[in-house]
Amino acid sequence: YADKVAAAFPHRLARSSDAPEAAGLYRRILAAQPDASVTVVSVGFLNNLRDLLDSTADAASPLKGEELVKRKVRQWVCMGGKFPDGRFDDGNGEYNVMYDTSGSVRAIHDWPTPVVFTGFEIGARIKTGAGLRSLPEANPVRLAYLHYTGLEPRESWDQTAALFAVRGAGEFWTLSEPGLCLMHQRVPHGYNDWIPHAKGNHRYLVARMPANDLARIIEDLMIAPPRPRHP
């Protein structure tokens, strides 16, 4: 669906290869921000964040990747993993952390700021998307759902990460006890475990609000019209 959405709307890239390299783009953005001001949200594989941690000094900043993250980032919100038990019945882990497991291990184990995980179980219970039928056909979110689900409701994994990043736990969720998300680099697919630890830098979301109530809040945000552009 991503290619179809990209083809339907104007943009400046003639080819995907014209897009800036992710780690370098992260470095330029982070270097321009005040210290301890940035919330990073990930809703996919963690190879780009691994590459950011592995990056070296450049024109954007004299700091190495881990140093730059530690200085500029306040927290990382990661849609990934499954908590507290990271394995499904087949022994595999959650999609975003299990494939590029080396990237997941490096990013999760070595990230130098607090991390909040919104796990598989959080978004799986929240079904959204039906309201997109009311939007104009030229709406990019509607078009993405049209090609991916036929405008049928689906789980809201990524939306929960975005909502927490902007509004916090609020009345939606509670935070787990501090701990460590431990990644296992198993062949062919990795998985995570949760280890409670009083000095741990990781937490995960725990459901609080009824799923149907939270689905209405998220869907209202999904179908809200964009703010008018100022000249």
Located regions from the model:
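Short intrinsically disordered, low-complexity coil segments enriched in acidic
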Residues: Y1-K4, W157
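Active-site histidine-anchored catalytic micro-motif
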Residues: D3-G123
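Conformational coupling and interaction surfaces
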Residues: E94-P231
